[in-house]
Amino acid sequence: MIRVSVVGAKGRMGSHVVEAVRAADDTELALALDAGDDLTQITPQNTDVVVEFTVPAVSLNNVLTLVRQGVNVVVGTTGWTDEKLDQVRAALAETETIDGRKQSVFIAPNFAISAVLADVFARIAAPYFESAEVIELHHPDKVDAPSGTAIHTAHAIADARKAAGLGEMPDNTQTDDGSRGAVIDGVHVHAVRLRGLNAHEEVLLGNAGEQLVIRADSFDRISFMPGVLLAVRKVDSGEFPGLTVGLDQFLDL
């Protein structure tokens, strides 16, 4: 059995993770911690993998603490920048092995299989279209915008276009006033916050006379749980030492 501790266990996502860990045949709940709890309770003696779902303001410090504690970590909190990822890599470089295996941290912009596949499809399609934009739609309680998933998708589109030798996208906008959204690596990203939504993303790709729309919808947070459990199993396997970003790294694509 994989011993799993959950940090952020009382949150919207964390509570679902607790239930999923208890329900799975190959995982058991070790500790369920939330804001104010001491993370040094988590050690290799009681935990194989920690799942961290908190908020961007504290997630980096949580992960660095857990790395120092010597445990493997699966992170679902968004708001990760290249600078923060570099801090995690540096912390991992200073750690010792766990039972002869190098410590692992996994960070996912999204755990929904549909969203991960949509990102992959967008990367494949991007070189074949002149224009591409991303729209992400979430509930109004989400604290970050644009979403980590949308940022990840925008970078994937930009990388695919650069690899194909494409230049800038056509855009003759003269006045903006913020209506064109954020620009991530040259890709416009628009964020919608609306009561009744959960987590949704559209990628719009256009050529003269045609359009391709790639859309992923997560209507319930339960849709993230298969991805979370997959990440827990992969991290525990020891096959992915160091830092891994993106659930697509664990899929046979």
Swiss-Prot record:
Please state the span of the N-terminal signal peptide per the UniProt entry: none
Q: Which GO terms describe its molecular function?
A: 4-hydroxy-tetrahydrodipicolinate reductase; NAD binding; NADP binding; oxidoreductase activity, acting on CH or CH2 groups, NAD or NADP as acceptor
Q: Which UniProt keywords apply?
A: Amino-acid biosynthesis, Cytoplasm, Diaminopimelate biosynthesis, Lysine biosynthesis, NAD, NADP, Oxidoreductase
Record-listed NAD(+) binding positions? G8, A9, K10, G11, R12, M13, D34, G76, T77, T78, A108, P109, N110, F111
Which GO CC annotations does the UniProt entry carry?
cytosol
Name the reaction it catalyses: (S)-2,3,4,5-tetrahydrodipicolinate + NAD(+) + H2O = (2S,4S)-4-hydroxy-2,3,4,5-tetrahydrodipicolinate + NADH + H(+); (S)-2,3,4,5-tetrahydrodipicolinate + NADP(+) + H2O = (2S,4S)-4-hydroxy-2,3,4,5-tetrahydrodipicolinate + NADPH + H(+)
Keyword NADP among UniProt keywords? yes
Q: Per its UniProt record, what Gene3D superfamilies does this chain match?
A: Dihydrodipicolinate Reductase, domain 2, NAD(P)-binding Rossmann-like Domain
Active site per UniProt: H138, K142
Q: In which pathway does it act?
A: Amino-acid biosynthesis; L-lysine biosynthesis via DAP pathway; (S)-tetrahydrodipicolinate from L-aspartate: step 4/4
Identify the Pfam families for this entry. DapB_C, DapB_N
Q: Does the keyword NAD apply?
A: yes
EC number(s) stated in the UniProt entry for this protein: 1.17.1.8
Which example biological process does GO assign this protein? lysine biosynthetic process via diaminopimelate
| Binding-site residues for (S)-2,3,4,5-tetrahydrodipicolinate, renumbered to this chain | H139, G148, T149
Family the UniProt entry places it in: Belongs to the DapB family.
This chain's function reads: Catalyzes the conversion of 4-hydroxy-tetrahydrodipicolinate (HTPA) to tetrahydrodipicolinate.
Supply the HAMAP family for this chain. DapB (MF_00102)
The name this protein goes by in its record = 4-hydroxy-tetrahydrodipicolinate reductase
Biological source species: Bifidobacterium animalis subsp. lactis (strain AD011)
Its lineage opens with: Bacteria, Bacillati, Actinomycetota, Actinomycetes, Bifidobacteriales
Originating gene: dapB
